[in-house]
Each structure stands twice: as C-alpha cells, then as structure tokens.
From Swiss-Prot:
Residues 552-634 are annotated as: Disordered. The lineage of its organism: Eukaryota, Metazoa, Chordata, Craniata, Vertebrata. It holds the Pfam family zf-B_box. This is RING finger protein 207. Zn(2+) binds at residues 98, 101, 127, 132. It comes from Homo sapiens (Human).
Length: 634
C-alpha cells in the first residue's frame, strides 16, 4: 500500500469531515486488533503493519514519518493504552469462564452470568446457587456480569495482595509487601491511591488543555493557509489581468514577453500553491491525530478505574506531551504575493520603441525590484529564453555598503545645497546623537552585567528600571527617525528620477542609513532583553543584601569620606603654608644652617602630619568627630 489514506484536499470542506473512530484502524477500517504505536503517535493493527518494515525502519502510512524498530519482531510496541480501551469497549467483550466449573459463557449468556465482587470471580447460574448458598457467603456482593463493579481492588502480581499505594517516582502500583520491600528513601514518594488519582487527574487535565490549545492553533493555521491559497489564486488572477491589460496596448512588440511573464507567474503560482498545500496536508494529518487523542483521553477517563488510570494515565500524559512538543509548522513558510516585475520587463522590451535611455530603464528596473522583493530577474529567467534583466544585476543600488560614512563625507564636502545634502547633514547629527546614547547604554549595561556576575555587587532596582526606560525611549526615537526617513523616500525618488547620475551614490548612502538604524534598533532590542533578564536577579540580590547586611554600606562610606577630608585638609594646609609670607625669613635662616641639618625641616613638617593622622585614627575609633582643620606647630 502506498499509505496515501488522506487523499489530496479538494477544498475547505474536506477538513470538516467527521473524524475516524478512535478504536478503528485507518488501514483495515475495523476495530483494532493488537494496536501498535508509531513514533508519530499513529496507531495501526499489528497485522496491517507486518511486512512493511525496511532496514529496521517503518514508514507511517499516514504522515510518512519513519519509526526505528527495536527487536526482532519487526513491529512497533503494542499500544497498551489503546488496547485497554479496546478491551474495555462494548464490542470487545471476551468469553467468560465460570471460576467453579470452567463453563464458558458466550456474549448471549452475559445477562445470565454473574460476578461476585467480594470474591472477584465470575460464576454461572448453577454455581451461584450451589457455591454461595451457605450462610458464610450471605454477605457476598453478587451482581450480573455486565453490572460488575469496576472499582474491584486489583491484586499485586508478585504478592497477591491488593494495591494500596502508588509510587509517584517510579509510577508503579504497590501493595503493602511491595511497600515494605522498598528502600526508605523511595517510601517518601508513595501516596495513597485516592491522592495519586487526584494528582494524576490534574496533570492529565493540564495535558488535555495543552492539546486543545494546539488543536485550536492548528485549526487557525489551516484556516489561514486556506485563505492564503485563495489569496494566491486571486493574486495570480490580478497579476495576469494587469499583464493582459498592458499587453493589449503593445501587442505587436510584446508577444514573446507576454508568454514569458505568464510563464513566470504560473511558475510562482505552482510553487507557492504546492508549498501551501503540502503544509496544509501536513496539518490535515495532524488534526485527526489531535482529535483521536482527545477522544482517547475522554474514553480513558470514563472507562478506567483508579488503578487502571494510574497504570496507564502517565503513559497517556507522556504521549500527549510528546504530541505537543513535536515541531509543528503552523505559520506559512512564504508569502502569498505573486509579482512578475512586468513593468520593468515591458519597459526593457519597449526601449527601442520608446527611445528610453539605459540608465532610465535601469532606474525603473531597480525600483521595480525594490517593490517586488527582488523576485523579478530570477522569476523571469526561462530555460530557452534568458531574460535581459539579468544584465541589470550589476546595478549600484543593491544593498547598503560599509562605506556610508565615507560616502556621506564626500557628498557633504562638495558643498552643494541639494535637498539630499541637507537631509544628510540633519541625519548625521541625529544619528550621532542616537549612536552616543546607544554607546552610553551599552557601557552602562556592560558595567552592570560585570558588577552582577563578576563582582557580585549590590545593584539597585531603580538603576535597572532607569536603563530599561532609557532603552524604550531610545527605541521610540529610533522608530520615529526611521519612520521620518522612510517617509522621505517618495521625495527623494522624484529627485533620483531627474538626476540619476548622482542618485546611485545617494541611494547607497540612504539604504546604509536605514540599515544602521535597524542595526541600532536590533542592538537596542538585545540590550532591552538583557536588561529584562538581569532585573529579576538584581531585585532578588538586593532583597537578600538588605536582609542580611542592612548597614553594610554606611560605615565604609563614612570612613572613606573622613579619609578624603583628612587628605584634602593636609593639602590645603600645605598650600597655605607655602603662600604665607611670614615663613620666608624662617626659611632663609634655615638655609644658612649647615648642610648636614638640611633634613630637619622635612622632618618637622612631616612629624605633625603623622601625629595628626594618628590623632584622627584614635578619634575615629573612639567615635569622635573628625576635625576639618589642623593646627601646625610653630
């Protein structure tokens, strides 16, 4: 079998068809018989998958996803969850044997067969009267087999004891003997069945909500893709109409180019239509999978008792989590706009007729390439008729270069009072201002990041808020400048049409300016993200610092301030001593003394300073005030 169960989508209504039954195999269309689970979360009967494996890999018939097989059987593992639902459904009732006489009861005899909830065994009508006639069985709960209680306590397969506890660590049901055999560390993870059931239901509900959210997003993505398919169709039709309208006025000279343009539009249409439909087909295979698993969750909750839920519930949760965490392409991979650059092509084709200069045609081609996203020359290149637009790829207006500043300086050095030169003068001033603010923010964020990670210093939350506020303000300024710059494109376009020889350089500078602003904005976004990431850590560290060391900064600041005052006073006293004219005679007398005593003035001037420093330290230790002036001995 090719595996193409879901055929090509014929329209939006095909996605609204009723989904398949969750207990019916998509290949054989009957109830599952030993269902096997693939890595893509699709289930198939073991018989339907037998013989499909190649080199240890099995390709899913629905989504073509390959599953690596483990083991010599050549089949994926049995889906215990789906097998439980099949066994628990009404269509999967097996033959029951009487526990006393081994009489097999068929499906027609289910109503005449009984089940003892106390003994946990099925009984036929004759054995019910014979074995449970005694008085000791008078309190046994005997009901019809179809009405037996699903809450009958299951027993441990190792110790034949009823399950009492559940290990949240190993996800296993435990009897009392299993609990005694466990290590003491593992016993802390054991809870009673009721608590484990409540916790499991809560976790399963969260998983179901995640799947429902993915289901809603998938439906929205499918609707969006369907709308984009229609937009592609309408866009192609509009583009063809425009091409036909322009071709009608110049039929003789544009016959060959018309066919080429239509071929380009058709090629783009087929490419985009194929891409959208492939993505749509992928999402269409995902949606039934989500629906099936939601139905499985609902059926499992209604059919499973507590023990069965705890036995299989976490497997279901892991499966739902796996479905949600798988990569799903919910967004369109390309735009729905089709552009053929027909105006530039027609202008080039009509150049001999309309006597257009090559530079003017080049300007029209570059403008059309800008509007069409640069798709024109590549889209119009055919296998047998190469487009002459390819020769225009050497146009100087391609992308911003790294020599914008040099080109701007050369342009301004010419001294001409053109509109673009005035714009460049204004732009350079504003850009320099924005760049300076950006550099300031960079330095500040780097310093804060270094203080936080390397020095582990205390950073106030107000500082981070101020940095974030400045970053947002800078982003607004950059956006405003970019919008203002973008709004002048029309004005400059008219000037470039009139004087194209100078426009080539000006356009290069202009595009580079836009690129610089976008780069600044991107850097600012990075800084904003880093600031937002650092802010919670700064606040938490500040709170811890305030709790642990509330008076950590005060003594250090007072001591540093007092030392600074001492140093400033000593310098002021030295300066006043030099400026005092009364010290001149004394200095002359000292200079007349022998040279052997020339060290004495320095010693006398340094000794009071040392004494004053010792006096300052002693007063600071004793809690005294620090003097702001000093007395020099005469």
């Amino acid at each position: 079998m090719s595996g193409a169960i879901f055929g090509p989508l014929e329209g939006p209504s095909s996605l609204d068809a009723p989904s398949i039954h969750p207990l019916v195999c998509p290949l054989c269309h009957v109830q599952y018989e030993r269902p096997c689970l693939l890595d893509c979360f699709h289930d198939f009967c073991a018989g339907c998958l037998r013989g499909r494996a190649t080199d240890g890999r099995l390709t899913c018939p629905l989504c073509q996803h390959q599953t690596v097989l483990k083991g010599p059987s050549g089949l994926p593992p049995v889906d215990r969850l789906l097998q439980f639902l099949v066994d628990s459904s009404g269509d999967g009732v097996e033959a029951v044997r009487c526990a006393n006489c081994d009489l097999e009861c068929s499906e027609q005899d289910v109503e005449t067969t009984y089940f003892c909830n106390t003994c946990g065994q099925p009984l036929c009508a004759r054995c019910r009267d014979e074995t449970h006639r005694a008085r000791m069985f008078a309190r046994h709960d005997i009901v019809a087999l179809g009405q037996r209680s699903r809450d009958v306590p299951q027993k441990c397969t190792l110790h034949a004891e009823p399950y009492l506890l559940f290990s949240t660590d190993k996800k296993l049901l435990l009897c009392i003997r299993c609990f005694r055999d466990m290590q003491k560390e593992s016993r802390a993870h054991c809870v009673d069945l009721e608590s484990a059931y409540v916790q499991g239901c809560e976790r399963l509900e969260q998983a179901v909500l995640a799947v429902k959210a993915l289901q809603t997003a998938t439906r929205e993505a499918i609707a969006l893709l369907q709308a984009m398919v229609e937009e592609v169709r309408h866009s192609a039709a509009e583009e063809e109409d425009a091409i036909h309208a322009l071709f009608g006025s110049m039929q003789d000279r544009l016959a060959e180019r018309k066919a080429l343009l239509l071929q380009a539009v058709q090629s783009q249409y087929e490419e985009k239509d194929k891409a959208f439909k492939e993505q749509l087909s992928h999402l269409a295979t995902l949606l039934p999978t989500l629906q099936v698993h939601l139905v499985i969750c609902s059926s499992f909750l209604s059919l499973a008792n507590k023990a069965e839920f705890l036995d299989l519930g976490y497997e279901l949760m892991e499966r739902l989590q796996g479905i949600v965490t798988r990569p799903h392409h919910l967004r369109p991979i390309q735009s729905s706009k089709i552009a053929s650059d027909h105006r530039a092509e027609f202008a080039r084709c009509l150049e001999p007729l309309l006597l257009l200069g090559p530079r003017r045609v080049a300007a029209a081609a570059s403008g059309a390439n800008t509007l069409a996203g640069g798709l024109g020359p590549k889209a119009l290149t055919g296998p047998h008729c190469p487009s002459p637009v390819g020769k225009m790829s050497g146009s100087p207006v391609q992308k911003p270069t790294l020599h914008r500043s040099i080109s701007t300086k050369v342009l301004l050095a010419e001294g001409e009072n053109t509109p673009f030169a005035e714009h460049c003068r204004h732009y350079e001033d504003s850009y320099r201002h924005l760049q300076a603010e950006m550099q300031s923010l960079k330095d500040q964020v780097q310093e804060l990041h270094r203080d936080l990670t390397k020095h582990h210093s205390l950073i106030k939350a107000e500082i981070m808020g101020d940095v974030l506020h400045k970053s947002l303000q800078l982003d607004v300024q950059i956006a405003s400048e970019h919008a203002s710059l973008e709004g002048m494109r029309v004005v400059f376009q008219e000037i470039w049409e009139e004087a194209y020889q100078r426009v080539a350089n000006e356009q290069e500078i202009y595009e580079a300016q836009l690129h610089d602003l976008l780069q600044l904005r991107q850097e600012n976004a990075y800084l904003t993200t880093i600031t937002k990431q650092i802010t919670p850590y700064v606040r938490s560290i500040a709170k811890v610092k305030e709790r642990l060391e509330p008076r950590f900064q005060a003594p250090v600041d007072e001591q540093s301030e007092s030392l600074q005052n001492t140093h400033d006073d000593s310098r002021n006293n030295a300066a006043s001593a030099r400026n005092n004219p009364g010290s001149v005679p004394e200095k002359r007398e000292k200079t007349s003394e022998p040279k052997g005593n020339s060290w004495a003035p320095n010693g006398l001037s340094e000794e009071p300073l040392l004494k004053n420093m010792d006096h300052h330290r002693s007063k600071q230790k004793n809690g005294g005030d620090v003097p702001t002036w000093r007395e020099h001995p005469t």
